[in-house]
Amino acid sequence: MDQEHPQEPIEYQISNELDLHTFLPNELGELIPDYIGLCLQKDILRIRIIHGKGIGTIRETVHSLLRRDLRVLRFELASHEEGGWGATVAWLSQTLNKSNDKM
């Protein structure tokens, strides 16, 4: 890394879609929960996570993270029109998020 020009964090606009092609697999454990929290802050309750088709390692990691997150009501592979098995759609619980904010 250049000491004169330290690398600045990249800011992303939060939308209902997260494309993981620009992220490393070891970043997903923090990225996905943070993304869900930011979506809930913006009242985005249906999200689409693009993980690519590949051999399924990223997809399995995404599904594992979604399965463990209590703010996720359910998830499934996207419809053919939304990317098929290269993307996952999840529905989030705003109610659960608001009760967690009060803790």
Predicted regions and their residues:
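Long, charged, low-complexity intrinsically disordered regions
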Residues: 1-103
